[in-house]
Every structure is written in C-alpha cells, then in structure tokens.
Amino acid sequence: MHCRASAIPDRHPDELTTEEGRRLLEQVRAFGEPLMVFTGGDPLKREDLFELLTCACRLGLRTTVTPSATPLLTARAIERIRDCGVLRMALSLDGPDAPTHDGFRGVAGSFERTLFGLRHARRIGLETQVNTTVTRHNVMHLAEIAARVAEVGARLWSVFFLVPMGRAQAADDLSAEQYEEVFEFLYETSRRAPFDVKTTEAQHYRRYVAERRKAEGSGAAPAAKPGSLARQAGINDGKGFVFISHTGEIYPSGFLPLSAGNIRRDPLAEVYRQAPLFRALRDPDGLEGKCGRCLYRRLCGGSRSRAYALTGNHLASDPRCVYQP
C-alpha cells in the first residue's frame, strides 16, 4: 500500500489533539525504548508536528519521521526535523526516474522533491531511509532504485510488499514465485550494498534468508549483513509492533484494519498485552493452514495483514508464500 491507498483531501476533524499526542508519547515511553515512527498521510500537515517530535525526543524515544514529498518538504522543514533530535527521516522512492515514480505516486514533481529531501538531509547530517513499495509496475526497476538509494547515501532501504487494500488492488501485486525472485535480489544486494536492507509485509524473507544461510554453511561466501534482519526476527503485526491511527485507534499494524481499542479510552500497554486480537497474533501455534505447520512460524509467521486482505482471516496462511512445510 502507498500513501494514495486511502487518500482523503483534508485532515480528519477528530484527529488527536496536541495534548492527546503528548499523553500518547508518554505511554509509548513507558514500554521502555521502542522506535517511534511519525507517519501519514503527511505528518507535515500538522502544525504541531515539530512540537510533538521534540516531545518524543526529549522523552528519550528513538524517533523517526516519514513526510510526504510535497511543497511542505522545504529545506527549512528538514532542518527543523533534524533540530528536534529526530534519528532518521524516511522518504518514499518507487522508481529510479520521474516517469516511473511520479506515475506510481500520481503526483508530478514528486520524484525531484524526494531526491531534494534526501540530498538536503544528507548535507545537514540527518540520517535517511528510502521506502520502496514493490508492485508489478516497478519490480523490473529494483536494481536501478537500489543504485539511487546508494547515490543519496541512505542508511536503510525499506522494501514494502503490497497489501491489497484501498486503491492498492491484488492485480498490482506480485505472484508468490515473483516474491522469491525479489528475495533473491534483496539478499544479494544486502551482501554488497552500503546500506541495510529491510522488508515490510514480507515476513517470509526471513525464511528465505535462513534457508540460504543454511545452504551456504559456514564455509560459504560471506552472509548478508545481519543487522536489520536480526532486529526484525519474529516481529509481526501486533508482535513487537503497534500502530496508532490519527484518531487514536489501536491496530496491530497500519496494514491490518482491525482495531483493538482507542487510546482515548484504553491504556496502550493494556491493549497491546491483553487484547484478544494482539494475544492471538502473538501465538504462532494458533496460525491456520500451512503457516500453522511451518517450521519457520516463530521466525516468520507470514503476513497477517495480507492474509486478512486476501482471505478475510488474519490467522490464515499468507497467500504469497511458496514454501510448503
């Protein structure tokens, strides 16, 4: 899914207030030291964004922000993001050139604004991340996009795999076999690239990497850098991850539209730890179909969001996995 998937032209009238945002950040900090991501939509549309970023950083939260490449992403805005103490800024890049990227985003000029944002952040010492959503329309350009990621000096390439929802339809997605081909490309890229590679909604990439490393053995060529993959191990929707919407709804992820509560009435930690939805998502033995029988169910667990989007059952097998346990 990309930012146009459930697009609305104006801000929601019932979105969280600044004070509610502050209270939310305090609840997040009570978890320990999680990574806090401000995303959207476009978080720059909130006049209090910099106030909330500063609050998060002063609370000791590792904080990142994912603005949209719009005219709001000025040099001054990027400098203010840095000055708030933000760890990293992420921007989306879905093609190696303007026709591909702007065609995907549906906004002329988005490609140039994205490159400007990434390059300016690098100039002023703000770490960057590039997010790419893989679809059948840009899969053939992944090597060129990876070259762009290296060119702009990004620290991380976060590759999103499609969850058909909103305007992102199943016809845009890859086949299960194509997923494996992309996994091979990402694995080989991660060996030599000057940046880390991370996947989102492709939990079975962990299974692919585990199988490759097992096949290579200790005497084989150097394995892919373990950093981001090791940090992802076992993380899934509602399992090491929680998403709070602009109106306070508590979801297992931004791609699984099943709410377990609302921070306006429910303590975040209580929902995360006790809500039946979250508890079910953290039980790999409760998964159905081949995911429930899979040797890698604790490492991987499949995309719960994709299972729900394509089958209506968040505990079903991930339809885009070729592995047969």
Locations of regions flagged by a protein language model:
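Radical SAM/AdoMet-radical enzyme domain recognition
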Residues: 15-39, 45-169
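Short, acidic, Ser/Thr-enriched surface-loop or helix-capping motifs
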Residues: 151, 244-245
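A structural motif corresponding to the C-terminal lobe/cap of the Radical SAM core domain
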Residues: 151, 169-195, 231-232, 313-325
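C-terminal accessory region of radical SAM enzymes
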Residues: 177-224, 249-302, 306
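Short, small/polar residue-rich loop motifs at catalytic or cofactor-binding pockets
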Residues: 235-239
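Cys/His-coordinated zinc-binding microdomains
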Residues: 4, 295, 304, 322-325
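Short microdomains enriched in Cys/His and/or Lys/Arg
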Residues: 18-30, 310-325
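Canonical Radical SAM [4Fe-4S] cluster-binding loop centered on the CxxxCxxC motif
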Residues: 1-16
